[in-house]
Every structure is written in C-alpha cells, then in structure tokens.
Amino acid sequence: MTILDKRQIQRFASDTDIETLSKAIDDDGVAIVRSVVSRDVIQRLQKEVESSDQPVWLEDNPSLKDSKFPSQARHANNLVPASKTYRDDILNNSAVHTTCKAVFRDVGDYWLTTGILRTTKPGSPAQGFHRDALLYPVLQYQPPTSPPLTVALLVSMTDATVANGATRVILGSHKWETVGTPSEDQAVRAELDAGDMLVIHQRLVHAGGEHTHQAPDTRRMLLMFLTSCQLVALESPLALSRELVETMTPLAQKMVGWRTVRPVEPNTVGLNTHRSGCLEDGLKLRAAKPLEGQDGH
C-alpha cells in the first residue's frame, strides 16, 4: 500500500459553505470544523447527561454485559431524553447541518442514527485502524466511488491532544478498496480545541489514540453518527415519547425519525410516511418554533 503524504487535516470556520466542505471531504475523507459549539453548551450537555435520571451509561446496560468496554472509558447514549441541550442546541446546530448537507448532497435527507457521549481516562488503550460503517453490513458492497451513506461527527468537549488520545486518521484512505494493514506513519493526528468538530467519511481509515498518563485529566467527546434517511436508525424513534418530541423543533424532530424525510429522485413520496403523506400531518404533530434560518421542515 502506498504511503500517503503527511498533509494535515484541513480546518474550516463554522460558517463555511457546503461546496467548500464537500470538496474537502471528497478529497481527504476528513475535515475539522472549528468552534461548532460553545463552552457553555458543552458544560450544560455534560451536566445534564451525568445527572440524568434516564438510563444512559452503556456499561450499566445488562444486555451489554458481555461487551468488552475498556475500564478507563465510559459511554452514554439515550441522549435525546437525557439532555435538553442535546435536543435544542446540538440537533439544531447550523454547522452540523451544513456539514451533513455537504456529505449527503447526492442522496437527500439524513437523520441521526445514534449519539454517544464518551469519556476516557489515562490508560484507555488505542484503537486499531478501522472504518465506521460496521452497523450497516450492506455498505461493504459499495464501491469507493459511491456517495457516502453515513458520517461520523466527533465534537470535542475537552481539548484533544496526542497525549490524551487524539484520533489518528489517514487522509485519502476513503478511496482505498480495503482497510488492509495501515502503518502509523501513514496517519496524522486530529488535535482539537474544545468545541471543534471532526468530520469522518464512512470509509475513512482511522483509530482513536491512547489516553496516556501524561494527560491526567478526563477527556470528553460527543460522537454523532448520521446516515442517509434511506438507512434505519440504530436508536428507534419509538423509544421517544410524543410529549417529549413535541417540545422539539421540526428540524430536530426530523433528526430523530418523527417526520417524513425526502431522499433524491426517483422517490417522490418520501420515506417514513403516513398513508403516503407527511407523517407529521397524519399524526397532527406539534413542534417548537423553528430557530431563525430554519424552514420548519
């Protein structure tokens, strides 16, 4: 396998346009968007999740008792009911949606498949190089030239450094036929300031780094996995109460599967419908007022 050059990950402002982000992701398979969320949002999200009366920690889930989680890491999901900040600030974040429109421009609407708040402490081991499309086995049959159907967004809640495990990524590896056996000298580190977002193409070869004892503080990150609306979500919308969903904006409702979505043609009726019409109309679903700049759909 040819060793790629050591170009670094391209970094963009949070108001960068769709076309610019699209080109970077197409070329490199990865990008960093700076200052996507504020420290206030990060602090509120962390507090709400860690104090939630909802079951959030995967390590405490009896159905996952045989899973081998590193003892120095914790993983929280079920974030929609657990955190108002997640529902209001994260699911409506304009930079998140601009990025998703850049990724999914050829396939239509997208939605959230799962969100995970991950913490690591010193001693958390490095991951092996991999791709993120494991949830959907059908994706292994896509050729490298196919448009992506999934994307991973990593929002750093603390600074991400080499010492605390900043992600290793191999630029351009989304164009490889297989993962193969990459070497460390092919990778660069995705060092991030708190609030920055790392964008990972579904085929990009990457790996979390080791959280070394040189970085004694806990590292926190929000991992969001989004897919084309043509793929079913990992976290079922049936688990969300209507009462909770009706406190959310129309855009956030669509992200969690409570509205009709639109892939590209030749589909003309949408997906997730009610009698071939809009689900939200059939349910007479209420919603919070759209945020400024949102179209309410």
Curated annotation (Swiss-Prot):
The keyword Amino-acid biosynthesis does not apply. GO terms for biological process: terpenoid biosynthetic process. Its cofactor is Fe cation. InterPro entries: Phytyl_CoA_dOase-like. Pathway: Secondary metabolite biosynthesis; terpenoid biosynthesis. Keywords: Dioxygenase, Iron, Metal-binding, Oxidoreductase. Fe cation binds at H130, D132, H206. It holds the Pfam family PhyH. Its EC number is 1.14.-.-. The keyword Iron applies. GO terms for molecular function: dioxygenase activity; metal ion binding. In A.calidoustus, the austinoid gene cluster lies on a contiguous DNA region, while clusters from E.nidulans and P.brasilianum are split in their respective genomes. Genetic rearrangements provoked variability among the clusters and E.nidulans produces the least number of austionoid derivatives with the end products austinol and dehydroaustinol, while P.brasilianum can produce until acetoxydehydroaustin, and A.calidoustus produces the highest number of identified derivatives. Homodimer. Iron/alpha-ketoglutarate-dependent dioxygenase; part of the gene cluster that mediates the biosynthesis of calidodehydroaustin, a fungal meroterpenoid. The first step of the pathway is the synthesis of 3,5-dimethylorsellinic acid by the polyketide synthase ausA. 3,5-dimethylorsellinic acid is then prenylated by the polyprenyl transferase ausN. Further epoxidation by the FAD-dependent monooxygenase ausM and cyclization by the probable terpene cyclase ausL lead to the formation of protoaustinoid A. Belongs to the PhyH family. This is Iron/alpha-ketoglutarate-dependent dioxygenase ausU. It comes from Aspergillus calidoustus. The gene is ausU.
